[in-house]
Amino acid sequence: MIAFNLACYASVTGRIEEAKERLRNAIDLNKDVRILALDDEDLRPLWDWITDLQ
């Protein structure tokens, strides 16, 4: 969950590319994180990107 939390922090501070990288790492560790991310307001700027992930 640390990678997920760091992704949230990066997102709310406008560091979108860093947020994507950290979220990708979190999803690689636990696929269920993708579902959590789509419900987290901190990650709203990434929702389209998350939806497009394979």
Model-inferred region functions:
Residues 1, 35-36:
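Start-of-helix register in tetratricopeptide repeats
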Residues 25-26:
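Canonical positions in the second alpha-helix
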